[in-house]
Amino acid sequence: LHVRSRRQRQMCIRDSDIIKDSGEFVVNLTTRKLCYATDYCGVKSGRNTDKFADMHLTPQQSVKIAAPAIKESPVNIECKVKDIIELGSHDMFIAEVVAVNVDEKLLDSKGALRLQDADLIAYSHGQYYTLGDNIGKFGYSVKK
């Protein structure tokens, strides 16, 4: 897994500094319901504000690392940093996934994530989008 974090932010605690110091982080997948909080946490500095409190989010103890997860997130991906690559204004963190925690209500009888029920969102080019519509199955392009 790799994530990028902007290094050149003034007057704020930079995520990249926190990740460098701790060597770990959690990727919390987010939902339509959490979209406002997701945006707020992405643009608001944590230097003088408690984003958990401001957005009524609950910190949750991770299973394998010390970094907290967000309880309201349906999927938490716990990661340990393996390498850091400086890319201009960003750092790229190459990380090992050490645990994945999923809200059991979103798993089917075989343990697969029911994506259509998760109501996950994605961010692309300044916009938030919902996910979840099944538009094909692996191999459908070559089946007759």
Where are these regions (language model features)?
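Active-site-proximal mixed secondary-structure blocks
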Residues: Q10, R14-K144
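Single conserved hydrophobic/aromatic residue that forms the stacking wall/gate
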Residues: L1-I13
